[in-house]
Each structure stands twice: as structure tokens, then as C-alpha cells.
Amino acid sequence: MHIFLIRHGESMANVGANYEKRIPDHLVSLTENGKAQAYENGKWLADYCKEKNIDLSKARIWRSPYLRTRQTSEEFNRHLGISDIREDITLTEQQFGLFDAVPEEDWKRLYPNEYAEYKRQCSNFGKFYARLPMGESPFDVAIRIHQFMGTIYRDFEKHGVDTLFIFTHGTTLRTFLLRWFHYSPEWYQEERNPKNCWIREIDGNIDLGYINDK
């Protein structure tokens, strides 16, 4: 199975505009720069697939239903030309709960008690397992992403869908890698969050890393 994991392009949240406008996370859109990133990297990826003789006739796009991942996939697909497009709620971003849309440097000031409890969990259990107040931990995201893997295995076995382009979010992308390759929580802690529109390639049981991290 050939899989391309793709983080969304630059969003309003990445430049802090969602906090000012109080935009719900699932409705945060790409910036104009983010749309350009997605368009340019989509062209790059289409050329890459052609150069590597990757057959897209049975390819499928999976994406998080958030607006920014939808927009990213649409810009990429201007070049990929894939008609089979599906969404899955397990591909959504880590839920930040009380801290959603709040800059991390403001967590302690705005929510001192909740922040103290979160830091206690980080100290006692590690950041991978520590759950954000009213939100999720990376561990929680890893559990739900494992459910999605069952879907793509079934599609491969029953319908021969063997090339996937998965448009998702930073934490979700890394937990996918953790589950697919049985990486450790320590690996997750050391693994950098991908930049916008970075593409991670998986060929069967081989992690080829980010192929456009220029």
C-alpha cells in the first residue's frame, strides 16, 4: 500500500487570526498563502507520482472534514485529478478543549488552575498521555486513528484501493505514523510537527520520511 500523509496548508490559526475572530476550529480556513502552498505542492506531488510511475487509477483521497483540510485537498487535486474523495471524522485535529484557539503562551494566564492540572499530568504521565482540559491527548488521537486504519485495510482487501492521499493535521499525522510503524511514545515526543503542506510518504512497511521538506 502506498500512502501519502499531507498536513494542511497555512491556516488562519497558524497566523493567529482565528483567536482574534473567534472562529470555531473546524471552520478555520486557509490563508491566501496557504492556498498557494497547497496548489504548488499539489503540482509538485503530481509530477513526483508521474516520475515514480505511481498508478493513480485506483487512488483515493481521504481527508479530515475540517475546512482547511478540505481546501488543501482541493488545491492538491487540481493536479492529481482523483475522483474518489472521502472524509472521516477520525482524521480531525487533536481537540484542544478549553485551550482551543488560545495561544499556548496564554494558557497559564487565562486558565491557571486548569493549566496547573495539565502540567501535573505531563509531569506524572508524560506529555503524550496528558489530556488537555476538556480535550484530548496525543494518546487519545492515536486510539481513534487506529480505527481509521481498519477502514483502509478493508478497502485494500475488498476493493484493491492501494494508493491513498490522506489530508490531515499535525498531531493526527504523527499518531498515524506511530500506529502504522509501531513507533514508541518516545519517538512521538522527539518527532517534529510537520510544516504546512509537508508530505510524508509510506511505501508498504517503509517510512520514506517527508519528501518535500525543503
PLM ranges: what are they?
Residues H2-S83:
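Active-site-proximal alpha-helix that buttresses catalytic centers in soluble enzyme cores
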Residues R63-S64, I143, F167-T168:
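Short beta-strand scaffold positions
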Residues S11, T172-L173:
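Short active-site segment of divalent metal-dependent hydrolases/proteases
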Residues H8, I89-T90, H169:
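Active-site glycine-centered loops adjacent to acidic/histidine catalytic or metal-binding residues
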Residues I3, A59, G160-G170:
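Generic beta-sheet signal
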Residues P24-V28, N77-R144, Y210-D213:
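Phosphate-handling substructures
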Residues H146, G150:
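Helix-loop module immediately N-terminal to the HCX5R catalytic loop
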Residues M1-H2, N41-W44, E51, I82, ...:
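Acidic, low-complexity terminal tails and accessory targeting/binding regions
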